[in-house]
Amino acid sequence: MTRATPDPALPRTGAPSGTARGSRRVWWLLLWVALITQMVVLYAPSAPGGPEVSGLDKVIHASVFGAPALFALLAGVPPRWVLGLLVLHAPVSELVQATMLPSRDGDVADGVADVTGIALALGAFMVIPPTRRW
């Protein structure tokens, strides 16, 4: 018996193409960069000084949770893991800041901003057509 060779004109099924694998690698790289940035921003012994812009702290909190959420989803991590772990991490990070970092303080509003960033990332992921995700 001879095996039929696939018709190159037909779309491939099964494993992702080389382009898809390459794109996923980029999302994984961005995810790791975002996670490292998140750890530095959340757990630095003292909050970095800067201009006092109203609401900037909340935007930063939303960003350091939203970016890893979006990159993880785009990398193909199941949404339940992304949402579960990051939503759990939000209050934990505030508790650590309040109890273990003397020059930092925990804030419920920061936790709300964290979860808002995660929700915005999920919303962005859902509106990106699947064919454009990777």
Where are these regions (language model features)?
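Bulky hydrophobic segments
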Residues: 2-111, 115, 119-134
